[in-house]
Amino acid sequence: RLTQQQYNKVMEQVDVIVTPTWQGPATRFDEIVPGAPLTKGFTWVFNFNGMPALSICCGFSSNGLPLGLQIAGRLFDETTVFRVAHAYENATPWHERRPPV
């Protein structure tokens, strides 16, 4: 509850928080170890607090794997999160490119 109160205080000053989704490019599917914790992500804090957040592509690594940009908003304000993501995608070409499968 304390974390959520601190988050709400920050959100009084900004519309959204933008962070990387992950500490680097996406993990290749064949490199994922079943049952291993996914500790390199930054999504947990928003999930833990029940805050709306989404991840969109913001580029690609040198080997073609996607880089994620996370946008998080105020409690129950999914609309702003989606609008910011939509504006970013309209301003950049990343959503048009596909990673190797």
Where are these regions (language model features)?
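Serine-dependent amide/ester hydrolase catalytic core
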Residues: R1-F48, E96-V101
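Structural helix-boundary/capping segments
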Residues: L2, F48-V101
